[in-house]
């Protein structure tokens, strides 16, 4: 039976002592994953800039002066060259992003070819192309696309302060089409947009209460880019960021949690705490679309220090709800059993 989360349950989690939250998250993580293994993906911008949307965090919006170099859709040869390099570096998934509001019909055949050719390299494929209309999700799935990324970004109530060119329901509708098509969902959010705790809670509830939780959940720390409306936004507290990673793991125990944008500005200790809290995937490479990312040598050094091994093979996940007694422990705050991931 799938856990149905509500605000009170999640708020109670956030109210617990920091180390209690991490302890529970690590136990749940070990129940479902090899805690010393990390999945590597590579993200390539296949069409950059001139996006008509007004997402306040995004340097690719045509509405902001961010000095982003506008690039037209890459050729198949260019994409495959990057995919081959990604595989050589250890990535098991190749993600492709296009700065569109939605894919145009004229590009669908090319996208189909790209998917099929990348898969021939033995890589999983993921695309983020904006809102999907009509039968586009079905056609991408038929072409062999494994994952479709479409982030919710933040809570429904805060969303309108960040994006006005597409609605929250538009995003949810796209996720429904993706799930119905048979593709796996990659969907998460951005922390540090100026949201409150309640917004983080509502975002996690929205994700976890989808018909099936996303198989992949990217958690981003806002990268403040000069020229965007959020360039001077106050940074999220590091402990609040780590705590949110941990509670994401508790709420969605079998999903891969990707520590995504913002790692370039995180020290090794912060990243290590995120991995301890249940993050088990990263993007490999010096750039995420248009924002900086740690160089592979730096990541390799960190993995070596932490004893983390790169996951080379894809395995089927066990989506059963947890029932191990080790996930139950006593909260001194309430003098009663604090949490049972099976019965919540």
UniProtKB/Swiss-Prot annotation:
UniProt catalytic activity: (4R,5S)-dethiobiotin + (sulfur carrier)-SH + 2 reduced [2Fe-2S]-[ferredoxin] + 2 S-adenosyl-L-methionine = (sulfur carrier)-H + biotin + 2 5'-deoxyadenosine + 2 L-methionine + 2 oxidized [2Fe-2S]-[ferredoxin]
Pathway listed: Cofactor biosynthesis; biotin biosynthesis; biotin from 7,8-diaminononanoate: step 2/2
Molecular functions per Gene Ontology: 2 iron, 2 sulfur cluster binding; 4 iron, 4 sulfur cluster binding; biotin synthase activity; iron ion binding
Cofactor note: Binds 1 [4Fe-4S] cluster. The cluster is coordinated with 3 cysteines and an exchangeable S-adenosyl-L-methionine.
Sequence ranges assigned to domain Radical SAM core in this UniProt record: 36-260
PROSITE patterns: RADICAL_SAM
Pfam (any one): BATS
Known function: Catalyzes the conversion of dethiobiotin (DTB) to biotin by the insertion of a sulfur atom into dethiobiotin via a radical-based mechanism.
Protein name: Biotin synthase
